[in-house]
Swiss-Prot record:
TM annotation in the entry: none
Name of the protein in question: Large ribosomal subunit protein uL18
Keywords, comma-separated and alphabetical: Ribonucleoprotein, Ribosomal protein, RNA-binding, rRNA-binding
GO cellular component: cytosolic large ribosomal subunit
Organism: Haloferax mediterranei (strain ATCC 33500 / DSM 1411 / JCM 8866 / NBRC 14739 / NCIMB 2177 / R-4)
GO biological process: ribosomal large subunit assembly; translation
Amino acid sequence: MATGPRYKVPMRRRREVRTDYHQRLRLLKSGKPRLVARVSNKHVRAQLVTPGPQGDETHAAATSADLDEYGWEAPTGNLPSAYLTGYLAGIRALAAGVEEAVLDIGLNTATPGNKVFAVQEGAIDAGLEIPHNDAVLADWDRNRGVHIAEYAEQLDEPLYSGDFDATNLPEHFDEVLGNLQEDE
């Protein structure tokens, strides 16, 4: 371990690989609420957050587990569920009076077409004003899950035996999106 007067121990949340303080400061200087998008292998979370003296204040939040209320039966860690989670977070943010935000992807890599940008696209389609570059957003077929359905069709039947038939994912996506739009 490095020692000496020039050695500086990183802040705890940076050591735990949880917070990029340089990025956080840039986002806070914008003065807009942050759309915090966090993804895991099983779920997607989206929150609209503003900084406060006692800590960050959450104005609206949605997780992919909330999609069950709207009829979502597919797994909750994929790209279509990320889009729908962003859409749901956008609806809830507009209901809470938040109309604009900036995307906070945390320590995720900014790969075009990934799940954090699907969350952003869902929130934009719900009506939030979020500055973005269209080059990072996935095409509509990918948001609907056409790529997952095509892959599921190629699999042998014994290898593919789940509770949900992924070959019907695009139609299921359209159905759940319609349910979300009805509840706006």
